[in-house]
């Protein structure tokens, strides 16, 4: 008999009513008495489990009744509609085969476990309701983002993981080497001789695919990357991880306003898609994790995003009368408390802050006519503050070279990036979305470690 997915049973219960089906899955819960028992069976295809009813008519009733949690079984039985019960149907088992036994020391017994504890068993935590919901939503949201760009004719570019350039100019990068760390070759100046290394120069794990994506935008017009990025930032916070995923579109013949429109369209599309394709999971998050999740998402979907310049935002914050921990003055990098005040108290919806001081932004952002600010934007959203950062890129060769020198960066490292301006350069723009930060926003999960399957953070690289 062909296996039927639990998802199919839930989505089309009438079709399967009174039919004999075969389902396979893992035991989430088991209750038994002398004459009959109940199994909550989850097959991974759906958030909810299916209830299996079995009785002494089974040849192996006693064996089944003693099965430990997480044992895997194959069940054949009739689908019985139960409109008055918690679940719309159950399966009356006619045959249960044991696929794999679980040891009695299985750590996920029927009790509440803290997220901190579940991080220590990251290989087992997707079997819990919270993480089953989280990682299915992660999958659905990733698909939605790909579909958004594909429907609009964007080319998906696979940018390199190993790179010789630092997009942010921040220097917080993981080094890649095959050298013997106990016997590093050194030059006459006593410094490590990078020419003897695998690539013949210093290389690192990428912090962003943006620079490479720009090269492809100047050939394909509209492109995007969606891949892992790495920061050797020793920040032990709920919002930082050493390995995370970034969505980075680049569009040619575009200015800052175009990329803000793209940002707004993509966010609304992805959120709508998740609400439509993961209703059970989103209801779970709204009930048990963060009771404002659905309201927050619908606020984003149904709002026209606000727009305000950095200079105007500073003035609004200074005149607000609010007691901020960090003083507000022109030139500061806005702190989370400032960002949340703007989005939650002033606009009460997502808002783009634009035209930041050049001294707090990256070298590649286009210098404005005032010479003090750049064509950059951060999208601030209620609940967390900054969600997305974007900018119009500097297309003028001389201005870009001046910025690189001004920041003390090595011009030679960016020779190919500068050449993009020599050969038919044009105005172009893009943004970066930290995918995990987006997931935290739509699920209410408060720690980035809980939206990545196997988190990599300072002092932790288990699994």
From Swiss-Prot:
Gene Ontology cellular component terms for the protein in this record: cytoplasm
Keyword Membrane listed: no
GO MF annotation list: asparagine-tRNA ligase activity; ATP binding; catalytic activity, acting on a protein; nucleic acid binding; transferase activity
EC top class named in words: ligase
UniProt keyword annotations, A-Z: Aminoacyl-tRNA synthetase, ATP-binding, Cytoplasm, Ligase, Nucleotide-binding, Protein biosynthesis
Record's catalysed reaction(s): tRNA(Asn) + L-asparagine + ATP = L-asparaginyl-tRNA(Asn) + AMP + diphosphate + H(+)
EC identifiers of the protein: 6.1.1.22
Organism domain of life: Bacteria
Record family assignment: Belongs to the class-II aminoacyl-tRNA synthetase family.
Protein name: Asparagine--tRNA ligase
